[in-house]
Amino acid sequence: MASVQASRRQWCYLCDLPKMPWAMVWDFSEAVCRGCVNFEGADRIELLIDAARQLKRSHVLPEGRSPGPPALKHPTSKDLASTGSQGSQLPPPQAQAQPSGTGGSVSGPDRYDRATSSSRLALPSPALEYTLGSRLANGLGREEAVAEGARRALLGSIPSLMPPGLLAAAVSGLGGRALTLAPGLSPARPLFGSDFEKEKQQRNADCLAELNEAMRGRAEEWHGRPKAVREQLLALSACAPFNVRFKKDHGLVGRVFAFDATARPPGYEFELKLFTEYPCGSGNVYAGVLAVARQMFHDALREPGKALASSGFKYLEYERRHGSGEWRQLGELLTDGVRSFREPAPAEALPQQYPEPAPAALCGPPPRAPSRNLAPTPRRRKASPEPEGETAGKMTTEEQQQRHWVAPGGPYSSETPGVPSPIAALKNVAEALGHSPKDPGGGGGSVRAGGASPAASSTTQPPAQHRLVARNGEAEVSPTAGAEAVSGGGSGTGATPGAPLCCTLCRERLEDTHFVQCPSVPGHKFCFPCSREFIKAQGPAGEVYCPSGDKCPLVGSSVPWAFMQGEIATILAGDIKVKKERDP
């Protein structure tokens, strides 16, 4: 009775599993089961059928499968009676030597007679042989069985996914059945053939050669190229690296880290070329947008069977500012005019600039802070003091973003003196505070305490200034504790070593840590007199924004920051007198 039920089953074209007739849907170009229709959706079934048809055609091996017997018929009661004693067990391996002339029978030996001829494809795994042989009892005509041979062609690639040594051992363990392999098959044969491997290796070699040439041009600042090309490449290279992702699948993220210009033969015009690492940290480098877009398009599998209809720029998005969640279409940054160097890239579309690590350090794992999460988080205002231990390990958002891009051992890593680590910054500031206010090492910090509003602190605070510091989340009362407050913003102020800190408005030199720092723009620093005059000019009503006159947005949002009432009262208080360096 089980054989009768098996003969009524039909095979789904997509999942390739036996289904009862009532579970099949015949409304499409191929018979599919209701499970596949419900899982994939009726609107996508035809696309998947086309993709499956192309895959099965492209994976059919040259040897193919012999059509075998001319026809199959349903088992009769006489056949069932003759095979009743054999239906519960598989025949021994020697049964393969029987001739395959029993076309009208569905008995057990028929499962193995397909492997007797050298022109037929034999599967090394007994489980796969059983799966293939059991399909002969589905009652299909030989015309449909030919299509079934192509339909099941994907099974031939399954053993190739195993290590070659394991596959060779499995084949040798079959004894006499190992001789039934087709002449063109080899246990150690690669999945896509030697031609595919050679083509892949050649592509990688060409891409690395182009990348080497691009890095050499970057080191020489593209000497000998036209001025427009040179300036464009320098501007774009200053913005690298930055993230790119696939528009239809945001989980596919790569990283653009280099640019170059290639000459086009017709008019000897130059065309922009960018180099992308995808996925991030994999070390796989793609030259050009089309190559990485094709790979992302293939990995997304949203619309299999289709090809890219454009150059790939409309399928990719780039991150305008790292960690902000602001993604724009790559075609807005690299327009046709920009790619042909006829016009400069729009300044408002350029990605946020970060230190550019070497390509070797680009793919390394990001460094870890001792006990802090390095993911950029939006700043939030705090009205209560924090313990000094937590303050010492705090990093600003700018510092987090910089450390995200720099890998250990790179030219901008935390171990090098170019960009000091938070511990080194703390030591430098402590030494500066201990020697002289004019020491260049003391000019690299600000008093931003992690909140969204400006703050000010001093190394030797009077009691009136203790309230100001506590209001902004830092409860230091000694020069050492004050250095901890400065270390949190050492990398976020953007000040270069040796450059004096000056007020953005009056250009007067600022005391080491006595100034108002804009939390959004590192270059916005204001002295207390200018901040006081700005607050008074705004009047008592309304919000008081950045003293520069701009409404600087908070990191990760479009909402501008504003002074808190406690901060306004502290800045306007008359008992705070900031001592300038020029004062005696």
Swiss-Prot record:
Record EC number: 2.3.2.27
Protein name in the entry: Interferon regulatory factor 2-binding protein 1
Pfam families to which the protein is assigned, alphabetical: IRF-2BP1_2, IRF-2BP1_2_M, zf-C3HC4_IRF-2BP1_2
Organism per entry: Mus musculus (Mouse)
Residue segments, region Disordered: 59-120, 346-421, 433-495
Main function: Acts as a transcriptional corepressor in a IRF2-dependent manner; this repression is not mediated by histone deacetylase activities. May act as an E3 ligase towards JDP2, enhancing its polyubiquitination. Represses ATF2-dependent transcriptional activation.
Biased composition (Low complexity): 82-100, 449-458
GO cellular component labels: nucleoplasm; nucleus
Stretches of the chain forming a coiled coil according to its record: 197-217
Superkingdom of the source species: Eukaryota
Lineage of source species: Eukaryota, Metazoa, Chordata, Craniata, Vertebrata
Region (Cys-rich): 503-550
